[in-house]
Every structure is written in C-alpha cells, then in structure tokens.
Design a protein with these regions (language model features):
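Structural signature of FAD isoalloxazine-binding scaffolds in flavoprotein oxidoreductases
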Residues: 35-38
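Conserved hydrophobic/aromatic beta-strand scaffold that supports enzyme active sites
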Residues: 11, 41-43
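Conserved small/polar residues in nucleotide/adenosyl-binding loops
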Residues: 3-10
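ATP-binding/phosphotransfer module of carbohydrate and carboxylate kinases, centering on a glycine-rich
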Residues: 5, 28, 43-50, 55-196
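Adenylate-forming
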Residues: 1, 19-22, 42
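Short beta-strand segments
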Residues: 10-17, 21-23
Length: 196
C-alpha cells in the first residue's frame, strides 16, 4: 500500500540480472521507445566485467545473483582468509550459498556483500540525483539477504548522495516477493493501460 501512495519511486530487482522500473504519480515511465529504466546497464566500472549486452562494466555484472557470485570468486583469488566457499565448484555455486556463509561470519562472503552493496549504493545515489524518488524498493532473490545487502547499500548510497537528498530517500524491501512479483507487475500494467 505504501508503494502506491508515493509520487515517485524506483523499483530495483536483484535477481539473476538487475531489472528496474521508475514510477511517477502512479505511472510507469517507459521513455519514447519503451526501454526507459535499464538501470542494470549503466556503466559503473570502465572496462569492467563483460556483460551479456556486449558492453563492459554494467552494474548488473556486479549487483545481481550472478554478480555477487563473480565477486566471491574474485575475492577468493585475492583474500587469504579461510572460507567455506572455497570448497564449492563455480558451477555449483549460487548467491544463497554466499548469503548462508555470510550469516555464519564467513569473511569472503561478508566482503562480497559489502562490495555488492557499495556498487549498488553508489549507483543508487546517482539514480536519486536524476529521479528524486521518495523511496527505492528492492526485491528479487538477492534482496532476501536482508541486512547483508541493505546495510552496505544504504551506507554507500548516503555516503555518495548529493547533499540535498541525504537522509531523505527510503531504501525498502518490496512488499511483493517471489515469483508473483513479475505476474502482479505485468497485470498491473495491463490494467492501467485498459483503464486510461
């Protein structure tokens, strides 16, 4: 309900990739060609990780279930700290394993979440500068990690925020989670178009 009452809000999906949508006064912003909101494909690291879109350094290569998996493997190559993650083959590895390890205090997993939160928080600070939302809602698999992703994201977002926006934008978990989110979102868009 609180999502519907806000004038401007941004929604970020942290799943296998990174999806997003920008809503203003209850209306989805599509842009002139329907592709507005491709937040996952902003460049956050020049000549960074290769993305499926063909570019390098896209946000979703750092801030998604796939991105945090890549981060954890990169960290295992550079960190000497013991980690339960070292015993798992890359093909068998997923974000839920990183989350479970972080909950148990695994230093590699904790650093993977900190770094992921840093990348997301810095990017969200830029989005706030452009969209000036009342709130940003995170949902999707990676957001289920709770404070592991929300705390560093909030900290880095505030740390990099333009001063006029500091401490004014809420970062919240979406009330809609799981497989129903996409179905409900698509249904709402169709309903909205039919009732114009």
């Amino acid at each position: 309900r609180r999502q519907r009452q806000m004038c401007i809000r941004d929604r970020i999906t942290l799943g296998t990739g990174l999806g997003s949508g920008f809503v203003s006064n209850g209306e989805m912003i599509y842009g002139h060609d329907g592709f507005a909101g491709e937040f996952g494909h902003i460049i956050v690291e020049r000549n960074g990780r290769e993305c499926g879109c063909g570019r390098k350094g896209c946000l979703e290569t750092y801030v998604s279930a796939t991105g945090i998996k890549r981060t954890a493997f990169e960290l295992m190559a550079t960190m000497t700290a013991p980690s339960k993650l070292r015993d798992i083959a890359f093909a068998d590895f997923d974000a839920s394993m990183i989350s479970a390890a972080a909950e148990q205090g695994d230093p590699v997993a904790l650093e993977a979440f900190r770094y992921t939160g840093e990348m997301l928080g810095r990017a969200l600070a830029d989005v706030v500068t452009v969209t000036s939302p009342e709130a940003i809602f995170l949902f999707g698999g990676l957001s289920k990690a709770g404070k592991l992703i929300f705390e560093p994201t909030q900290w880095y977002m505030e740390e990099n925020m333009l001063f006029v926006f500091k401490n004014k934008v809420k970062l919240l978990p979406s009330g809609i989670q799981g497989k129903n989110a996409a179905i409900l979102g698509a249904s709402a868009l169709i309903w909205q178009q039919e009732n114009k």
